[in-house]
Amino acid sequence: MKFFALAALFASTVNSIAVDGLIPGARVIPANDVVALKKAGAYHQKHHHRRTVIIRSSSSDEDDVSADFLWGIKRANHGGRLLLQNGKKYVIGKKLDLTFLKDIEVQLDGELKFTNDVPYWQANNFYYDFQKSISFWRWGGEDIKIFGSGVLNGNGQRWYNEFAGQEILDPNNKYYRPILFVTENATRVSVEGITQLNSPCWTNFFVRTKDISFDNVFIHAYSTNASALPKNTDGFDTLNVDGLTVTNTRVDIGDDCLSPKPNTTNVFVKNLWCNGTHGASMGSIGQYPGVLDIIENVWIENVTLLNGENGARLKAWAGPDVGYGRINNVTYKNIHVENTDNPIVLDQCYFNINATQCAAYPSRVNFTNIVFEDIYGTSSGKRGKVVADLTCSPNAVCSGIRLKNIHLTSPAGSPPVIVCDGIQGDIGVECQSSSNSTTKRSVDLARSLKYRA
């Protein structure tokens, strides 16, 4: 009898410890309670069992669970997992600083949705000087895993409507829009399986981050208003990043599919699908006066680019008050383009600068050791017969530029035209100067229409 009494007392003590400090609607499942983990939806074949934290979900789009989410993150930190359950919605209406993380998993099977309270978010956010960027939240620390079958929803329609007709790089722009997912001072971050939907601005922005990977992610931005389409909803943007991997991912947005920015090194991309985008881009870099920018050691393979402005693109700023730097050791291999305005383009007259200004104040960003190999498909014909425009600045070095096995055609006619100006050495294929009278008309058309945003 004493044994059973002691056992009952022990069980009572354990239960009291387990619920101590819980907030309403929350619970914690021990890692060894496999039955409870399975019942809650926290059992995952690819991930080991962990102490799992569950928080209450939102009862409506007005039910902000930001405080619950932050509590859940803190409770799951240091070896646990926060589970956002399938079929449930979690509304975030307050900015969140999540830069204290260490060894945490977030299993997103439900929907994590931000409010569209524009006045609140424009007054309460995390601000970055680079291109006047803001975010709802920021994730930092080390060993952070986000996975699942759920949705991270930026709720961007109101932002699209109110930003219509404006430009992100307009120096007078004051309508700042949040980025959907931001890492800052983070190491070893992985995101797998989720959908990222309708970001108000860039979808992902990684700042001072090392070793971040995305696998099997779907990024999508669409508008229900034909006169207010999503703008600047880039798939991936970086700043001071070493080690970015993107694999088996689909991107259906209205801007760059991929766009590493200043001081990004060691990028690996494989099996990427992009629709309606501005290309798998390097840059832009060289924007800020006197600042050295670098992009280096990039491998991009097995990419499909459909119905877009650009395919494989490198872009650098020109003008009287810009920076300098280099894009070096970049390989594009096995790239399939269809109905794409500029299948291959080196753009050293970025952003919003005409040919006369660019000639007067050329770029100081070097493009070196750039390989385009096994590039095939069709242009849109919007740039005439030009399928590749490789034009370098007289102030910069363009060397080691190589094209191999290029099989691109244009519906505007044959033969397709590859333009090369200012490049040092043989590029490996026949190309023509833009001053050639037989190509000048197509080139002028291409450059007059070339996208500048």
Swiss-Prot record:
EC numbers on record: 3.2.1.67
Repeat (PbH1) residue spans along the chain: 295-316, 327-348, 362-405
Localization: Secreted
This protein's GO CC annotations: extracellular region
S-S bridge residues: 257-274, 392-398
Entry superkingdom: Eukaryota
Active site: 255 (proton donor), 278
Glycosylation site list: 185, 225, 263, 275, 302, 329, 354, 366, 436
Reaction(s) the record says it catalyses: [(1->4)-alpha-D-galacturonosyl](n) + H2O = alpha-D-galacturonate + [(1->4)-alpha-D-galacturonosyl](n-1)
Class of the enzyme per the UniProt entry, highest EC level: hydrolase
GO molecular function annotation: galacturan 1,4-alpha-galacturonidase activity; polygalacturonase activity
A Pfam family that the UniProt record links to this protein: Glyco_hydro_28
Cross-referenced InterPro entries: Glyco_hydro_28 (IPR000743), Pectin_lyas_fold (IPR012334), Pectin_lyase_fold/virulence (IPR011050)
Alphabetized UniProt keyword annotations: Cell wall biogenesis/degradation, Disulfide bond, Glycoprotein, Glycosidase, Hydrolase, Repeat, Secreted, Signal
Signal peptide stretch: 1-16
A GO biological process held by the record: cell wall organization
Function as written in the Swiss-Prot or TrEMBL entry: Specific in hydrolyzing the terminal glycosidic bond of polygalacturonic acid and oligogalacturonates.
Annotated family: Belongs to the glycosyl hydrolase 28 family.
Protein name stated in the entry: Probable exopolygalacturonase B
Source organism: Aspergillus fumigatus (strain CBS 144.89 / FGSC A1163 / CEA10) (Neosartorya fumigata)
Species classification: Eukaryota, Fungi, Dikarya, Ascomycota, Pezizomycotina
